[in-house]
Amino acid sequence: MSGQQKTSELVFFVNGKKVTDTNPDPECTLLTYLRDKLRLCGTKLGCAEGGCGACTVVISRMDRGQNKIRHLAVNACLTPVCAMHGCAVTTVEGIGSTRTRLHPVQERLAKAHGSQCGFCTPGIVMSMYALLRSAEQPSMRDLEVAFQGNLCRCTGYRPILEGYKTFTKEFACGMGDKCCKVNGKGCGGGDDTQSVTDDTLFERSQFQPLDPSQEPIFPPELQLTPTYDSESLIFSSERVTWYRPTTLQELLQLKSDHPSAKLVVGNTEVGVEVKFKHFLYPHLINPTQVPELLEVRESEESIYFGAAVSLMEIDALLRQRIEELPEAQTRLFQCAVDMLHYFAGKQIRNVACLGGNIMTGSPISDMNPVLTAAGARLEVASLVGGKTSHRTVHMGTGFFTGYRRNVIEPHEVLLGIHFQKTTPDQHVVAFKQARRRDDDIAIVNAAVNVRFEPRTNVVAGISMAFGGMAPTTVLAPRTSQLMVKQPLDHHLVERVAESLCGELPLAASAPGGMIAYRRALVVSLIFKAYLSISRKLSEAGIISTDAIPAEERSGAELFHTPVLRSAQLFERVCSEQPVCDPIGRPEVHAAALKQATGEAIYTDDIPRMDGELYLGLVLSTKPRAKITKLDASEALALEGVHAFFSHKDLTEHENEVGPVFHDEHVFAAAEVHCYGQIVGAVAADNKALAQRAARLVRVEYEELAPVIVTIEQAIEHGSYFPDYPRYVNKGNVEEAFAAAEHTYEGSCRMGGQEHFYLETHAAVAVPRDSDELELFCSTQHPSEVQKLVAHVTTLPAHRVVCRAKRLGGGFGGKESRGISVALPVALAAYRLRRPVRCMLDRDEDMLITGTRHPFLFKYKVAFASDGLITACDIECYNNAGWSMDLSFSVLERAMYHFENCYRIPNVRVGGWVCKTNLPSNTAFRGFGGPQGMFAGEHIIRDVARIVGRDVLDVMRLNFYKTGDITHYNQKLEHFPIERCLDDCLAQSRYHEKRTEIAKFNRENRWRKRGMAVIPTKYGIAFGVMHLNQAGALINVYGDGSVLLSHGGVEIGQGLNTKMIQCAARALGIPIELIHISETATDKVPNTSPTAASVGSDLNGMAVLDACEKLNKRLAPIKEALPQGTWQEWINKAYFDRVSLSATGFYAMPGIGYHPETNPNARTYSYYTNGVGISVVEIDCLTGDHQVLSTDIVMDIGSSINPAIDIGQIEGAFMQGYGLFTLEELMYSPQGMLYSRGPGMYKLPGFADIPGEFNVSLLTGAPNPRAVYSSKAVGEPPLFIGSSAFFAIKEAIAAARQEQGLTGDFPLEAPSTSARIRMACQDKFTNLLEIPEEGSFTPWNIVP
């Protein structure tokens, strides 16, 4: 076969339609094929590494061995299109649409308010669809597993689960056979999941029933044509050849001819290497039709799995055998199943195979430690002298010979793996610790295979294997030998721990970092294994039940995702409110149905235009250096490459840009200031070519020093932006300190946060006639893009139009940083007179665009013996990166919010904007507020600890009261924080839980719980006065339909939905008559960014202004036709020549405070307040944690749309939870970002939401300063996520107290598993020798 030259024909089906390709590209993914060739853009590119699930599609294939059709959710971003031969692909467009019929999975997600920005929605829909095609009535556990590979950055996951649990077995109805789900009338049924959800947020009775008989049939041609599976295939392109052999002989011959060829089954490793490491494999072999690699057979001693059998198939069969066979025989099976549950996401497990896992040899593989400890037997084959040769290899000592290398020769093929059945005296256990439990790579994992002397706890033999401690999976033979013939008890385990510390060292600079934590995990996981095995020995009566102290037994347990319980409480509209008046009603997001069907168009979904080019960016590979050479000749020599752009194509003035200060460059000029700075751009025919050409551009540097990365380094070098520090003062701090009963000095620190909007930055620029330039841009600030494009091209602004229909998330990251992509794209389009497009890959986006600002706070506080705070002197430092961007405003908000809800009569706040060699950090939801309040909550807890009072009491003592004045001279009006607190305490059963937590902590040594209360006060307004304005335009057409335009951008926050609701009430018409098309600078000029949570406040009032103008014009007509309809009034107005178009404008009154020029004005229009209470449990041995419950009460005035507002609260909480506990940016000491995708950067997933999640909107609290008495909601709830952080800190304190450690201890945010574990000092951490800081160069640092 390897000598075959003819390229085969690729045949597969997509949404029921046959696709035939005579020249497929082996380098092309299914996602690229769907989007670029078939124009099916519902499937999204979110990460390109199989970590976010936005690209999920369903692959259906005929299993001829079992004569059944299998439906699998897969990641289209990793799936090679050549692997689709003989398959049927279903995308989100193929299951339903708004124009024909919605599928129930689309409808329920949308109507349950489970779609906000909508970019992740098609992937989540298809994960659910795949589950229902495999199990018509799944369980809640099935639901949990189905979504392990999907991420959502907006919703907080709760509404998605609430909508989809209506498909599950647990969603039961007491009507039995009379249930409306059975008789096809939809469901308003019951719920066995104990959810107390107020189901008025959505009407379950409106859901259409699921009818499996209506699903698309599997293409008969594929079902009836076995040659699709039996024929050998070869697909060739200029660089790569793809082979699909169908016999073992063919496979071995190919491997003999091409020993370096890669075998590709799921492409989950090779795909990532090709995409991000730019590896080129000229020969790829797909062995999925070779029977010997798909074989499954069972004997008395083992189960044999072919090397290409998928992990999900292995999991299913092992689970079946666990149910059928005696427990003593299935301990290895159970261990494997436990590890597989946390192995990637379901989309990966559906296609990945165990053979690939073994042969890849990752040092942090989840399965290799299990197989190594078990000494798994492998079957290997090769061609020797033209004949097939077989041999057996054992995984164990010597199997792995180096990083990603093993004893299997390049020309050999792994055929399969034997899973041994265990004996009654054998126990196998394994543990994995990662940053996040679901879909994450291990930090350290461990597997133990131990045999005991019959009916004793005396070790007869033991094998311990570890991942994450060396370049390969490693064994601990010396420690294992020490254990032989010894009883497994506490004494032995202590000796084992000490021995392992010596046997498994780790260099202080080892890749991956977290050195002390990883070493601690080795002994901690072995201790968990000891507890787990001892419990089983105790249950078998082999050792005494008292052998393990009762308080230690829970140390063996793992966290499991509980079934969600939730409540959403809000004020219902009064019965007298007209039905057509939507204000206060939980209307569905205006675009939700389009998003759920894949019909919603985002920037990169815009159809390709004739002559369109793609722009590939050339990025700096140095943190600080002079550019000595820039040579694009090699790139320009490629066919299909049309131009290269750099600073040489602009004047110095044109190249200087920035949102406020023009201290940035479109293209780096003489110097680069950070990794990832844009040096140039290549315009080519397509994305792959443009990116390949960009990598060929030669940039030579002369490196400069010093390179400043961290805040501490900036302080050391005095590296601050001009005009800093700045101070805000109130009262007399020095006098207050002199008179104080107590003073305390402390500090706290928190890291940055990646926005991780699911849609990366994107722009399309189209030159028009008359020197016009039209941009479609994923930006929160179209007018800023318009202004800077005009600046760069030297066009007047009226020749540049910027459009933003919708964004796939923003969170502040698209407020100013959109120019990074938009300006090079616009320049290229303008100069080449051709349409140009660019959408950043995830790694590019994370490298280029900056993050939330890391902060360091140093404070001194004065207080009385009862805890009343009298003064605070605080220094605030933020890490701005290399340019100013909006860092000055972020710092100012932090300085204005540090006191949170607490009155401090004497204040001195100093602020420093640190200049470092990082990409410029930027706006992020909260905009410095959460960082400032983080310091305030440390201060209040420090005070409570020192005076020995309960934190809650000290909070109440120091709370602001209505009428108090802040340190920036703003009087607090309508300040309901005590009411929010009281409601939240009652809702959460705070005092009852306090008692329960104390009891739990007494009874458990290695598990601890904590509880924290977090209040929040968030000021609403832009920090600069001129941005607090908005405009609107309303056009009414002859048929009565209304086209509404406003200056805000729909980012997923429901702004368009709310604006439609506002206009509907103002005009007295149904929402169905109103449509918003897009945000565009030619409709509403000079817009402010959609940011600062004021989108509804500003644009809503502008919309009302426009509506009032229309109403005044229509008033005489309505008086003349009092019984007329809206359409009749509009028709009459048209014929009476009354203008049916109106503009609206609003400028927020009473703001613009400046201590010298405008001292009587407000800084903020008003405040949004709330209180959150979280209960958290930690595993002291691993640092893992779980949020058991969260209760939130928010004062958001009179809600315009409670479903959207509650969704914003839940989403903000989860984003804040990620900020404070989970999301860690990893940088090299030179400032290179390691965490450039979901593989290393972990945001919360479905399994991370609180087990009980209750949100209540404060009733009877209208706000006179915003549209329809509402309040801003986007940013204020985010800081409540810190309740998990402070609950974790309380739990750690409980663990430390048992060790006699009663003082304060540092804990940086995020409180990752590493920081939690190392703060829980105990006998295991005390075994470690920690090298002195400064004695080595760490692998990573915190900026």
UniProtKB/Swiss-Prot annotation:
GO terms for molecular function: 2 iron, 2 sulfur cluster binding; FAD binding; flavin adenine dinucleotide binding; iron ion binding; molybdopterin cofactor binding; xanthine dehydrogenase activity. This is Xanthine dehydrogenase. The active site is at 1275 (proton acceptor). PANTHER family: XANTHINE DEHYDROGENASE. Binds 1 Mo-molybdopterin (Mo-MPT) cofactor per subunit. Its EC number is 1.17.1.4. Belongs to the xanthine dehydrogenase family. It comes from Drosophila pseudoobscura pseudoobscura. Substrate binds at residues 815, 893, 927. [2Fe-2S] cluster 1 binds at residues 47, 52, 55, 77. Residues 235-424 form the FAD-binding PCMH-type domain. Key enzyme in purine degradation. Catalyzes the oxidation of hypoxanthine to xanthine. Catalyzes the oxidation of xanthine to uric acid. Mo-molybdopterin binds at residues 780, 811, 925, 1092. The keyword NAD applies. Keywords: 2Fe-2S, FAD, Flavoprotein, Iron, Iron-sulfur, Metal-binding, Molybdenum, NAD, Oxidoreductase, Peroxisome.
